[in-house]
Amino acid sequence: MAEAQNIPAGSTTAGSIAVAAESTVATRMSAPPSFDVADFPVPHGREEEWRFTPLERLRGLHDGTAAVTGEGVRVEVEAPEGVTVETVGRDDARLGKAGTPVDRIAAQAYSSFEKASVVTVAKEAVLTEPIRIAVHGQGGVAFGHQVIELGAFAEAVVVIDHTGDAVLASNVEYVLGDGAKLTVVSVQDWDEKAVHVAQHNALVGRDASFKSVVVTFGGDVVRLHPRIAYAAPGGEAELFGLYFTDAGQHQEHRLFVDHNTPHCKSNVAYKGALQGQDAHAVWIGDVLIQAAAEGTDTYELNRNLVLTDGARVDSVPNLEIETGEIAGAGHASATGRFDDEQLFYLMSRGIPQAEARRLVVRGFFAELVQQIGLPDVEERLIAKIEAELEASV
C-alpha cells in the first residue's frame, strides 16, 4: 500500500495527497457517524478533529454541560411564492436525509433541538427572489435544525444570516432533487462573544448543482463543517468561503467532499484575512474519491493573507484517491504576509497607505464576493471588510 505524499507549504500550512493510504478521513474521526450523542466520547483536544479548537471557549457545547437557557435564537423565514415553510417535530421523516452527525456537538444538537424548520421548493419551481432565513441570537444557549429541500429541476437561492449573541449548535441539511440548482449564502456576522458550531450536510441529486458561499466575520468561536455527498452521477458542488479573523477570534472551517458516485465534480475555494493578536483561522479541506467514483473532477484551494503580527493560520488540504480512473484532482494552499512591494507600488502612484491596503485586501476577496450574486449582500460584505481594515489603521 502506497504511503501518503506530504507537501509542506509554509510554517502553518501543510497538505497531503494519499493514494490508498492507511490514514483515511474515516480513521481520523474519533467515532463513526451517529445521531446518538452517547456514541461520541467527550473530546479533550488531543483528537485529530479537535486539536485546533479551543474547547474551553465552547461554553459546554462539547461536553454536554451547555443547557438551553431562555431565548437562545429567533429564526425568521422570508420566502417567495412557491415555497413551503414548516415547523416540525423531531420525528419528521425528512430530517436526517442529507447526512448524519460526525462529531459530538453535531450529535448533541440533533438530540437536543425541539422543533426544526423545513423549507421546501416544489419541483420545477424557479424562484426569482431569494429565500431569506434570519437567525438572531438573543443571548442564550440554543440547538437548531434546518432543512432546505428542492424538488427535481427546481432552482433557488437561500441566504442564512446569523446575527446577535448566542451559544448555538446546529445541523443544516440541503437536499437537492435531480437536476435542481441551489445556491446558499451563509453569513456569520455574530456579536463578539457568540459561539457557533454547525454541521452542514448537502446531498446532491443526479445532474444537480449545489453552490455554497460561507462568509464568517463575527463571533468569539465559529466552527463550521460543510459536508457534500452525491446521490447519483452528474452532480456538481462548488464550495466558496471568505473569512476575516480579528484579534482573539477563532474561526474554523472544516470541509469534507465525499465523491461516492461516478462522474461528479467539486470545486472548493476559501480565502481568509487575519489581523490582531491571537487571531486564529483554521481551514481543513478533506476530499475523498472512493473506488466507485470514476470520472471524478475535483480541486480545492485555500489562501490566507496575514495582515499583522500575532495572527496564526492552520491550513490543511487532504486529498484521498481510491481509483486511478478520474478526470482530475488537485489542491493548493498558501499563507502569506501582506505584500509590501504591492503596497509600495500603489503608494508610488500617489495612493495613500490606508487606501492602498484596502485596495489590496478588496482585490484579494473580490472573486469570492462576486460569487454571491446578490448586490445587497455583496455591498454589506464589502462594507464589513472596509470596517475591519479601518479598525486596524
Regions found by a protein language model. Give the residues of each.
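Generic hydrophobic-segment detector
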Residues: 28-31, 39-41, 299-300, 340, ...
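Residue-level "edge-of-site" marker
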Residues: 50, 359-360
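Conserved beta-strand/loop scaffold segments within soluble protein domains that form the structured core
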Residues: 4, 96-351, 361, 365, ...
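N-terminal amphipathic, basic helical "cap/leader" segment at the start of enzyme domains
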Residues: 2-115, 126-127, 131, 270, ...
